[in-house]
């Protein structure tokens, strides 16, 4: 089976915006992969077609028949690769000061258990970018970490689709924090 770097398998505007953010911040780009768990953008991956979103290739119907949730799948796939709670493990690292996470509501469902494992003192490192439904699906004590983006982003130059909203809002946030300020008008 041939493999390619993860960043070449995932395409579309959402990935382009996430790549832009990683490059701008000189940060590591990672993907929440339904099939492979949390993976770095350079990780070799086989082509596959699996999602937690409401699409024909979704794992949701299969999980539902088993009485399981997407977060159970995330736990199992990461345990299979011997990387339990990989987001919590990153948050625990002292050398990592900031973690920006952009996920759709469906992918919030996927990583919810992992997020819940993040220690209280590591949570301030996080900034979460998701939709209003995504915020509602976050573990309750993480909702305050969700950046307050809403449909007003659609009237900006970063207008787009619901599917790429989390990554567009993350890009907007980074553009704002990275922009030089004019101290005379501040």
Please identify what each model-predicted range represents.
Residues 79-92, 106-118:
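A short, acidic, amphipathic alpha-helical segment used as a generic capping/interface helix at domain edges
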Residues 102-106, 130-132:
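Structural motif
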Residues 123-125, 130-186:
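C-terminal accessory extensions appended to soluble enzyme cores
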Residues 35-89:
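Long, charge-dense
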Residues 38-42, 108-111, 136-138:
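Short catalytic/ligand-binding loop motif for oxyanion handling, primarily in non-cytosolic enzymes
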Residues 1-52:
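A glycine-rich, hydrophobic loop/mini-helix early in the fold
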Residues 22-26, 89-99, 119-123:
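Flexible, charged surface loops at secondary-structure boundaries
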């Amino acid at each position: 089976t041939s493999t390619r770097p993860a960043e070449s398998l995932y395409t579309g505007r959402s990935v382009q915006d996430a790549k832009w953010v990683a490059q701008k911040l000189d940060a590591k780009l990672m993907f929440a992969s339904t099939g492979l768990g949390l993976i770095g953008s350079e990780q070799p991956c086989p082509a596959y077609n699996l999602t937690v979103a409401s699409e024909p290739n979704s794992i949701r119907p299969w999980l539902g028949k088993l009485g399981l949730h997407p977060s159970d799948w995330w736990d199992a796939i990461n345990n299979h690769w011997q990387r339990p709670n990989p987001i919590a493990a990153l948050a625990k690292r002292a050398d990592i000061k900031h973690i920006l996470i952009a996920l759709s509501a469906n992918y919030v469902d996927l990583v919810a258990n992992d997020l819940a494992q993040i220690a209280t003192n590591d949570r301030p490192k996080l900034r979460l970018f998701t939709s209003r439904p995504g915020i509602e699906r976050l573990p309750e004590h993480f909702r305050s970490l969700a950046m307050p983006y809403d449909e007003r982003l659609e009237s900006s130059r970063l207008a787009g689709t619901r599917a790429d909203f989390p990554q567009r809002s993350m890009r907007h946030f980074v553009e704002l924090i990275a922009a030089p300020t004019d101290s005379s008008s501040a």
